[in-house]
Amino acid sequence: MAENDIDRDAIKDEVDQIFGNRPKHEGPELYQVNDQSSIKHVIGVISGKGGVGKSLVTGILAIELQRAGYKVAILDGDITGPSIPKMFGLSGLHVFGQGDKIIPAQSKGGIKIMSTNLVLENENDPVLWRGPMLMGALKQFYEDTLWGDIDYLLVDMPPGTGDVALTVFQSLPIEGVVIVSSPQDLVQVIVGKAVKMATMMNVPVLGVVENMSYMECPECGHKLEPFGPSHLQEIVDEFKVADLGRIPIDPKVAASCDAGTFESELPEGLIPKAVSAVEA
């Protein structure tokens, strides 16, 4: 059969039959909250790598916004490595359903929280899910949770630029992101990837917070830099992003995260510029 004799209509019919005549998706799916919830602002907290304190910054922002009188919720988007529930004293607790919806957990201060650890039978069980299941969990957490009326939903995103991070950017109405870094030599390359990803997704970068920036001697007040000198100003200059502050290494804060007393023991005013950037 000559090329011009190919029955393209027959081929199309056969393909449609095989795939059930599925509709063609022109772009990524946009997630919608349920009709019993209203969220005014969605802010992402991201990092180019793990272990830099992204969840810590998410928690600080949530608590400071709550203290300022806003209604705040956290969606723990780090599906395979969630840490938010433990920080807020919710270890061992489980969310429950109401019809086909989910009632989120709530911290003592009133911050609503949805996380994988709140649905696992044992919070120490590994989450061995592939991409589609991770995306499905994120969609269900956002759409099916009864958030109520929320001023700020903070999304604690997984580190890096993988599937879940991409889905958050494409499918959630993210208004801006706070990037978390640490004072290591490779940080500029890592932060650069996060900045470029946000730019490619047309999501504004609110600025960069540097965690574990220094230690302050309790006796003399001298600042030590155990992880090397700060690179925050270099990042600000290179990528034209805002300096949202430096967080010191504080053993008391680390201990409160482990003990679940982070919310009540957090010192005020750690990153005021970051809070102001989110409010703006």
What are these regions (language model features)?
Residues 1-30, 195-280:
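C-terminal lobe/tail of nucleotide-utilizing enzymes
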Residues 148-155, 161, 173-194:
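Conserved Switch II/interswitch segment of TRAFAC-class P-loop GTPases
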Residues 34-40:
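Phosphate-binding P-loop
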Residues 39, 50, 76, 84, ...:
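Residue-level signature of catalytic and energy-coupling elements of molecular machines
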